[in-house]
């Protein structure tokens, strides 16, 4: 896996099995995952077409999954451990309608070990739980914003991480599992650090 920031877009390149809750999301095998900054006034006629066009502009011509955020990439948090690399942008100027004022929290988790289908989807739940906990611990009275999204992926040809020792995929990603605990730690750390940098 390689990643860089180009024109306020985080671009992650590799060979991934992934699932996304973002625009044009779903389950896919992709070569690129990206998180693009857009203006706070962002309101295109077709967000789905916009994200496809922006991918092309960034030189992404093959299969990809992408997210959008109003958060500047200078606030991007990258957290790596033996299990995964987490990429997190956090802002709370767009909170859920049933709570206060709002932003966007985007979470991208790239596992170094193969994930079962159960773990791939379960990691979304664990990351979302951790996001809510981070906000509550920061003193907010809401659990997220109305534009939040999560991408969970694993590298199909990775030979690093726990898989290299056990030669087995990670079966589950619930918050009580070792992998789930790592997700929780990374997400809480990344969200808190990102918000603090923005003075939120």
UniProtKB/Swiss-Prot annotation:
Keywords (A to Z) from UniProt: Hydrolase
Keyword Hydrolase: yes
Pathways involved: Cofactor biosynthesis; dicyanocobinamide salvage pathway
GO molecular function: adenosylcobinamide hydrolase activity
Catalytic activity: adenosylcob(III)inamide + H2O = (R)-1-aminopropan-2-ol + adenosylcob(III)yrate
Its biological purpose: Converts adenosylcobinamide (AdoCbi) to adenosylcobyric acid (AdoCby), an intermediate of the de novo coenzyme B12 biosynthetic route.
The protein's name in its UniProt record: Adenosylcobinamide amidohydrolase
């Amino acid at each position: 896996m390689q990643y860089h920031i180009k024109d306020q877009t985080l671009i992650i390149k590799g060979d991934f099995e992934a699932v996304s809750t973002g625009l044009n999301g779903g389950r896919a095998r992709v070569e690129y995952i990206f998180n693009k900054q857009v203006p706070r006034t962002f309101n295109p006629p077709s967000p789905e077409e916009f994200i496809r066009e922006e991918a092309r502009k960034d030189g992404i011509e093959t299969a990809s999954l992408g997210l959008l955020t109003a958060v500047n990439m200078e606030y991007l948090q990258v957290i790596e451990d033996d299990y995964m690399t987490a990429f997190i942008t956090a802002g709370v100027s767009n909170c859920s309608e049933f709570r206060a004022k709002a932003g966007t929290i985007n979470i991208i988790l790239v596992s170094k070990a193969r994930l079962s289908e159960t773990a791939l989807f379960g990691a979304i739940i664990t990351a979302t739980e951790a996001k809510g906990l981070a906000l509550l611990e920061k003193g907010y009275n809401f659990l997220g914003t109305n534009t939040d999204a999560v991408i969970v992926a694993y590298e199909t040809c990775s030979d690093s991480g726990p898989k290299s020792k056990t030669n087995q995929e990670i079966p589950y990603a619930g918050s009580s599992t070792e992998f789930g605990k790592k997700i929780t730690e990374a997400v809480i750390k990344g969200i808190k650090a990102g918000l603090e940098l923005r003075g939120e």
